[in-house]
Curated annotation (Swiss-Prot):
It catalyses: di-trans,octa-cis-undecaprenyl diphospho-N-acetyl-alpha-D-muramoyl-L-alanyl-D-glutamyl-meso-2,6-diaminopimeloyl-D-alanyl-D-alanine + UDP-N-acetyl-alpha-D-glucosamine = di-trans,octa-cis-undecaprenyl diphospho-[N-acetyl-alpha-D-glucosaminyl-(1->4)]-N-acetyl-alpha-D-muramoyl-L-alanyl-D-glutamyl-meso-2,6-diaminopimeloyl-D-alanyl-D-alanine + UDP + H(+). The gene is murG. It is a peripheral membrane protein. Its main location: membrane. One of its GO terms (molecular function) is UDP-N-acetyl-D-glucosamine:N-acetylmuramoyl-L-alanyl-D-glutamyl-meso-2,6-diaminopimelyl-D-alanyl-D-alanine-diphosphoundecaprenol 4-beta-N-acetylglucosaminlytransferase activity. Keywords: Cell cycle, Cell division, Cell inner membrane, Cell membrane, Cell shape, Cell wall biogenesis/degradation, Glycosyltransferase, Membrane, Peptidoglycan synthesis, Transferase. This is UDP-N-acetylglucosamine--N-acetylmuramyl-(pentapeptide) pyrophosphoryl-undecaprenol N-acetylglucosamine transferase. Belongs to the glycosyltransferase 28 family. MurG subfamily. The keyword Secreted does not apply. Pfam families: Glyco_tran_28_C (PF04101), Glyco_transf_28 (PF03033). Cell wall formation. Catalyzes the transfer of a GlcNAc subunit on undecaprenyl-pyrophosphoryl-MurNAc-pentapeptide (lipid intermediate I) to form undecaprenyl-pyrophosphoryl-MurNAc-(pentapeptide)GlcNAc (lipid intermediate II). Its EC number is 2.4.1.227.
Length: 358
């Protein structure tokens, strides 16, 4: 018998790679009439939460790693304070289920849920599971994953699940603007790894534009990106462009792009598959190499793009890869590979998986 879920709490925080799937889960559960509360660190003023009517509570946390004694004490104090506040919020909200989306930001909430014996589920977005998700999988009822190969890494039932994508309009001014150019290129570095792309990609694209005078670049520079400097590079190079810190209509940008140059976070990977957008992936070298594994999956398993490691990155290497990626036959083959893979992905929703496991 499938149990009715009335309330869920989502343990989340950190980068968009954790926030975006949490918001997609929230949307899916809200459509089922479920009351949803987000709990985690870094939610105040998070760009992914702007303009959304989201019920959330900020929960302190600390990174439980080796550090100087003073730093370690401060982090453990934040972690303990977060645990106490999370336990209080869970008592008030009284959810049927707590879902963790990885990162240490979710740790206090998962600890509190375990203490209160609230059923825990997890969602893993990457090909290499994060430490918090691996740790709590032994206590969880189940883990929903974005990509099937990662299911073998957990100590509880796991299933590839689908999440709804970010909302987008079929009549988008962005789509209309990009449709008037060819080729169209999207550059996106993510919420934390944009600087390297901001420093290298514009110069390479100015070189590429010599062969493609009608090229258009939609460059998402990230919250700390120097938008004005990037605009100057494109302007001096005679490239048509739009440069901004953040993009709310991301799906229309991807749908309208002939090529995406990006980091290899799980969210962008999932959206590239959905939009069937060929990509050049430059994985962020930190975080235990999970982005490199994500990139290898899209490039070598699926055949949807190419990969450049950051240590190999140069204007010459980028220019060569971009010119190859813009070849019409290359675009056609990579789109077909992405389409074939996406059509065979599991269609089971995370909501359905959780209901079945309870």
């Amino acid at each position: 018998m499938v149990k009715k879920i009335n309330k869920i709490a989502l343990a989340v925080g950190g980068s968009g790679g954790h926030i975006v799937p949490a918001l997609a889960t929230r949307e899916a559960f809200c459509k089922e009439g479920v009351d949803v509360l987000l709990l985690g660190k870094g939610l105040d003023n998070h760009p992914n939460l702007c303009d959304l009517d989201v019920h959330y509570k900020e929960i302190p946390s600390g990174l439980p790693t080796v550090a100087s004694p003073v730093t370690a004490i401060r982090r453990m104090s934040s972690l303990y304070n977060g645990y106490r506040k999370a336990k209080k919020e869970l008592c008030i909200f009284d959810p049927d289920v707590v879902i963790g989306f990885g990162s240490y930001h979710s740790l206090p909430v998962l600890m509190a849920a375990l203490k209160k014996k609230i059923p825990i589920f997890l969602h893993e977005q990457n090909l290499i599971p994060g430490r918090v998700n691996k740790l709590f999988s032994r206590f969880a009822k189940g883990v929903g994953v974005s990509f099937h190969p990662v299911t073998k890494n957990f100590r509880c039932p796991s299933q590839e699940v689908s999440l709804p994508k970010r909302a987008f309009s079929a009549c988008s001014p962005i789509a209309e603007r990009l449709a008037s150019h060819s080729p169209t290129i999207c550059v996106v570095g993510g919420s934390q790894g944009a600087k390297t792309l901001n420093d290298h990609v514009p110069l390479a694209l100015v070189e590429v534009a010599k062969d493609y005078p009608n090229m258009y670049v939609h460059h998402i520079a990230g919250p700390k990106g120097d938008v004005i400097s990037i605009q100057h590079i494109y302007s001096r190079g005679g490239v048509s462009f739009c440069v901004k810190h953040f993009e709310q209509d991301m799906l229309n940008v991807l749908l309208s792009s002939d090529l995406v140059i990006s980091r290899a976070g799980a969210t962008i990977l999932d959206e590239l598959l959905w939009a069937q957008s060929p990509a050049i992936l430059i994985p962020y070298p930190g975080a235990y190499g999970h982005q490199e594994e994500n990139a290898k999956f899209l490039v070598y398993t699926i055949g949807g793009g190419s990969m450049i490691l950051e240590k190999q990155l140069s204007q010459e290497v980028l220019t060569k890869n971009i010119l190859l990626a813009l070849d019409p036959e290359t675009i056609k083959n990579r789109r077909a590979a992405l389409r074939d893979y996406y059509q065979n992905k599991s269609s089971k929703s995370f909501y359905q998986f959780i209901c079945e496991c309870l």
